[in-house]
């Protein structure tokens, strides 16, 4: 998988978990387990949970705008 593919996969998984559980209840470890990556990958691509959340929301918005311009 390329770096872009890994980053995108993490965003998809994180978006689903944040949507289902909310920011407070979603954990980086849970996201890592479902995305099949380690915590270092989250830190490498996003820095921290808050930044991951922001990027996941931006990603969801992009997907919505593509679907319904």
Where are these regions (language model features)?
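Onset of an N-terminal alpha helix
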Residues: 3-11
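Helix-turn-helix
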Residues: 9, 17-51, 55
């Amino acid at each position: 998988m390329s770096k872009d593919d890994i980053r995108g996969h993490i965003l998809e998984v994180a978006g689903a978990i944040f949507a289902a559980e909310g920011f407070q209840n979603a954990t980086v470890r849970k996201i890592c387990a479902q995305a099949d990556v380690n915590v270092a990958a989250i830190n490498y691509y996003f820095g921290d949970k808050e930044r991951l959340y922001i990027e996941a929301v931006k990603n969801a918005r992009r997907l919505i705008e593509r679907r319904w311009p």
